[in-house]
């Protein structure tokens, strides 16, 4: 499988994750804790790197984020 990557950003969803987190008035740490309570493995650094687009995001992580924010996965994309 070939991964298409421009060498700069590693995901497209980071800005939307940050926007949704701020709307819910959560810190990165608080968001990570909420996702952990749902049974997903996230930490503050994971959230930071996703938001900064310096980390690839797995399909399971996309599911976790969309579940927590109560949105369709497609809504995470620009």
What residues fall within each predicted segment?
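A short, Lys/Arg-rich alpha-helix, primarily the initiator
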Residues: 1-24
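Phosphate-coordinating loops and pocket residues in cytosolic domains that bind phosphorylated ligands
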Residues: 78
């Amino acid at each position: 499988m070939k991964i298409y990557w421009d060498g700069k950003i590693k995901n497209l969803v980071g800005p939307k994750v940050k926007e949704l987190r701020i709307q819910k008035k959560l810190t990165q740490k608080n968001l990570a804790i909420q996702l952990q309570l749902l049974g997903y493995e996230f930490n503050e650094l994971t959230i930071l790197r996703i938001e900064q687009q310096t980390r690839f995001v797995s399909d399971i992580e996309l599911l976790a984020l969309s579940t927590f924010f109560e949105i369709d996965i497609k809504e995470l994309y620009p």
